[in-house]
Amino acid sequence: MSEKKVERVLTGTVVSNNRNKTIAVLIERKVRHPIYKKYIKRSTKVHAHDEKNKCALGDLVRVVEAKPFSKTKHWALLEVVEKSVFVD
């Protein structure tokens, strides 16, 4: 009875890449208010493992749930969906 575990995949924006092989990804979702029925933005920040340090600030990335890399890092970079364009 080997059941395949379903992996969670999230899409978000890189908000920090200051640490070596680690990125912080902001995941935004919309939830409906139970009383007022208005959609509200909610966000979660997760830390993900970036083995090759290829992410930059503002990149749209896809992360997948993985084994714990450290105390707060439980996600791994799956792919860079869209590179950001920053103009100084």
Swiss-Prot record:
Stored SUPFAM superfamilies: Nucleic acid-binding proteins
Signal peptide feature range: none
GO biological-process terms attached to the record: translation
CDD domains, alphabetized: Ribosomal_uS17
GO cellular component terms listed in the entry, alphabetical order: cytosolic small ribosomal subunit
GO molecular function terms listed in the Swiss-Prot or TrEMBL record: rRNA binding; structural constituent of ribosome
A Pfam family matched in the record: Ribosomal_S17
Key words of the record: Ribonucleoprotein, Ribosomal protein, RNA-binding, rRNA-binding
S-S bonds: none
Organism domain of life: Bacteria
Job of this protein: One of the primary rRNA binding proteins, it binds specifically to the 5'-end of 16S ribosomal RNA.
Family note: Belongs to the universal ribosomal protein uS17 family.
Protein name in UniProt: Small ribosomal subunit protein uS17
